[in-house]
């Protein structure tokens, strides 16, 4: 069943540590990224970091008297920027999984 597999050189502890390091690096890299979305021709702008925490919000003064429009633009903008962050997380996870083939290689 395990013919051809060299179990003498297989060190699962090292592989796990390597994977954990790769995952931590990816997590730190993602957290430092900033994603920005604009709606209403730039009247609303939201920026979030890779942890999906809002780091900046800009609203044009002209929207402050139009609650319905402001709500629509905020929802649209927020959904878009969250989607950007989620797509980035998926891409980073796929890249991390692609790196599994390099386990145990020095």
Swiss-Prot record:
InterPro entries: YbaB-like_sf, YbaB/EbfC. The keyword DNA-binding applies. It comes from the Bacteria. Keywords: Cytoplasm, DNA-binding. GO terms for cellular component: bacterial nucleoid; cytosol. The keyword Glycosyltransferase does not apply. Its main location: cytoplasm. GO terms for molecular function: DNA binding. It is found in: Cytoplasm, Nucleoid. Homodimer. PANTHER family: NUCLEOID-ASSOCIATED PROTEIN YBAB (PTHR33449:SF1). Binds to DNA and alters its conformation. May be involved in regulation of gene expression, nucleoid organization and DNA protection. Belongs to the YbaB/EbfC family. This is Nucleoid-associated protein Abu_0429. It comes from Aliarcobacter butzleri (strain RM4018) (Arcobacter butzleri).
């Amino acid at each position: 069943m395990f013919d051809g597999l060299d179990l003498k050189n297989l060190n699962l502890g090292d592989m796990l540590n390597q994977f954990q390091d790769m995952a931590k690096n990816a997590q730190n890299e993602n957290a430092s990224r900033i994603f920005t979305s604009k709606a209403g021709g730039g009247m609303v702008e939201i920026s979030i970091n890779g942890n999906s925490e809002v780091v900046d919000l800009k609203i044009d003064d002209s929207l402050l008297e139009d609650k319905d429009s402001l709500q629509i633009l905020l929802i649209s903008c927020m959904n878009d920027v969250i989607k950007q962050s989620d797509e980035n997380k998926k891409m980073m996870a796929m890249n991390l999984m692609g790196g599994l083939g390099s386990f145990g290689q020095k």
